[in-house]
Structures are given as C-alpha cells and as structure tokens.
Amino acid sequence: MPTISIPADPASPDQGLKPFPIQLDSKDGKSGKLVKQIRIKYLTEPNSRSPPLTFINTYGFIYARDLSGGIMNEQSSGIQSGSVTACMMTLGPGPDIKNANRVLAALNGFYVKVRKTSSLKEEAVFELVNVPKLLANHALCKQGRLVCSAEKFVKNPSKMMAGQEYLYFPTFVSLTYCPSNLNYQVAKPILKIRSRFVYSIHMEIIFRLLCKPDSPLLKTYATDPEGRGCLASVWIHVCNILKNKKIKQRGVDSYFSSKAISMQLTVSIADTWGPTVIIKANGHIPKTAAPFFSKDGVACHPLQDVSPALTKSLWSVGCEITKARLILQESNISDLLKTQDLITDQIKIKKGHSHFGRSSFNPFKKAISLPNLTQLGQDDED
C-alpha cells in the first residue's frame, strides 16, 4: 500500500504556542500573586475569504470560599489560602478582537462559580459572573452557564466537597485567531452511529508530550525512543463509508487506500475548544462521509471529548504530532470482532500546526495560590 509521509518541521516558528511561564508580582520572584498572561496564536491564512473569529480558552485554579459571603475578588479574605484544583474553561468562538491586549484587562473582576452535581456521572455546573462587554458575544459568555462532565474541565473533581462554595479565577488566557470555517464540530449522534452497511474510518494520532525527564507523566504514557518526553496514542472517528459493489470488485484493501488518497486528509492541533485536533479533507469527500465535515471539508475534535486524561496533561506540557494514520474497521461490533483492522499512512501532518506549545503552568503543583502564593509545591502525582 503506498504511503505519504510528510514530517513536521520542528524549526518552524509557526509550529508552537508560546508558553505560560510562572511569573510572580514580587521583586524576589519567590512570593506573591501569579501574573495573568495571554498567549496569542494566528491560524488565519492570508488569502482566506472566511471572516476571522477568535477562540478564547482560559486556564487557572479553583478556590474554596467561606460561605459568609461578601464582595468577591481575587484578594477577598473569604477565599481559603491555596487552590483546591486546576481548571480549564473555554469561552468558545466569538467575534474578531482587534486589540488582544484588552482581553486580560477585561477579565479583571470576572470569575466563575463552580458546583458539583450528578446524573449518570459526576457533573460540574459553571456560572459566569461579571462577564466583560468585550467577551459578551463569545459562545459560553452568551449562555452564562455550562453543565458538563466534571472530568472534562476540572483536574481533580474529587477534591471538591459538599458544604463549600467554589470559585474559578482564570490566570492564563489563550487567544486564537482563525477563519470562521474552523467553527465546526461533528454532531455527537453522528459519531455514535454504527451499522453493518458501512465501514468506520478512524485516525490514530501519536502525540509526543514534551515533558521533563523527571515528570510523573512518564509513568502514565509510553516511552519515547528519542528520549524527548513520552508518547500517547489517540483515536478519532473520522467518518463512515458505504459498502458497495466496488469493494467486492477491487477488494477492501485497494478500495480503502484509494479513498484515503482521494480525500487528501491533513491533521493539525490548536487551542480552540481547549486542545483540539483539526482534520481537513482537501480532496473528494464520499457522500456517506459528508456529515462528518463542514462544507469546507473541516472537522474539529476537542480532545477533552475524546481523551479527558490526555487533555489535562496538555494543560502543563507541550506536544507535537509525530505520526498519523487511518484505520478501517467494520462499524458493526459483531463484524468488527471477526475481522482485522486495515491501516494506512495516507495522512499529511499540516506544516506549521503540528505542535501544541509547552506551558509552565502546571496543574500538578499542590500549593499554587493566586491570592496568597508563597511557594511552588512539589509534584503531585495523583
């Protein structure tokens, strides 16, 4: 089976996101508050006809507050010293922001009330408070609240206990400028469809997590032969293709290879709905596969929906796509158990967008405190 292998260029300045270094507002750099920071990434193309939009993603910490009440801000005495756990909150897509420097100032006074509830599994309820005008038209800000699986956005939900009020303060802001055609996610009911009349095409992406030699992540993920971190495999359901007469005439192997070549798939990663895999079909999309892509051939897959555990690892370390390949499987589970997977490497890793920048923001630290930061704690391996 022919292969196309286009490795990413690590030297390209467009392939990384600027890190969030830990900075304190004190002269000695050893105590004080964390300094709020913004990271900016441009995915817009010079000749793009799509109007630009901005994705805003925030990272920070959840604190417990004394239920006696009072006016809230980051220095309120009612907040207990030391964070409870780390959190990611994506505000989603919104209109173009002309001056990125205004975003940090706009977030002063903004915070999120966080509560736990439960249905089939633990859920987190986020209520946005004091939403700034600048961000009022971003997706989550317009809704004002969000209910989702607690494990998606909260690093360690088990640390949040009944009888406390919890507040999330964003500390690090990721601002991504991109064309509006990147605002497309595949409907979840479509991703869940299984039928004996179709084949499922999945994409396996191998990420290299750029962690330090003493990182606890090395105990969780596969060893990197190059010694640059560790490796993680993620599978994403790309699309379904219909079984037809051509398969019997040409054979499944040949048919699958021709479909992979004709679709001309590329893959990249960006910080939009959190760390997000972007798959683009630059060629012909089969009719059965059309619902999995936008009219421009784009499909965005937020990693928190696919692999929440890996997403949390990416809050604190950078990553790069080292390999991507397609897997053809029977869609029907009974048929899948009787057949072998077919694998092809007909994937291009999009040059300039195969890296997710390393961040010094580390949710695996125990004692980072926004109101009263006195020292950085030791690594928390939980």
Curated annotation (Swiss-Prot):
Entry's localization field: Virion
Keywords: Viral matrix protein, Virion
Cellular component, GO annotation: virion component
Superkingdom to which the source organism belongs: Viruses
InterPro entries linked: Matrix_C (IPR042539), Matrix_N (IPR042540), Matrix_Paramyxo_C (IPR055413), Matrix_Paramyxo_N (IPR000982)
Gene Ontology terms for molecular function: structural constituent of virion
Biological process per Gene Ontology, one example term: virion assembly
Function, as annotated: The M protein has a crucial role in virus assembly and interacts with the RNP complex as well as with the viral membrane.
Family, as annotated: Belongs to the morbillivirus/respirovirus/rubulavirus M protein family.
Protein name, per record: Matrix protein
